[in-house]
Amino acid sequence: SVIDRDFKEAPQTVKFGKDEHVSNGASVDENNGIYVASDKYMRKVVWTGTKLSTDEKDGAWQSEYETGQEPPAIKEGTGTGSTPTLMGFGDDEDKLVVITDGANKMHIVAFWRDQIPADFKQKEGTKSNRIADQFSITAGQPADAKWIQSEQSVVVKGYGAFVVDNIVDKMPEDKLLGAIALG
């Protein structure tokens, strides 16, 4: 929702699918793009100055990304555990928004924030041509690790990115206890 700073107007709200869940924050760019990741889609919602829009003609979009199984602890749901992070500003050619996906062994996924370059071809293994690229995260874990998952936003500097793995080998079965134990 967007709320008038003087609290004189009714909040402007966008509702997603009844089967979707949003458990993270949103990011906002300098052109009124609002980036929200549900457990199924990464979205750009646009504030037009008078309303929130999910219409492509206003620059809005949605893209599927990879999901997985319910992890043993820390993260709720099967989608992303990260608030979208913006990457690329000013005169930088590539304006991206990045998240970690919900795959059991997560990927870092970069989506084109604005228009997809005309010569861009969808990367093999991605769910949409909105995905500029995605990379598997190993976090130094052995190849047979069942889980590599994060509940934090991706940290970026320029076009570099840093993520953490919040799943350990011996997790408590109780998610609350696991969150307390791991911080």
Which stretches of residues belong to each language-model region?
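Extracytoplasmic/lumenal domain signature
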Residues: 1-23, 27-183
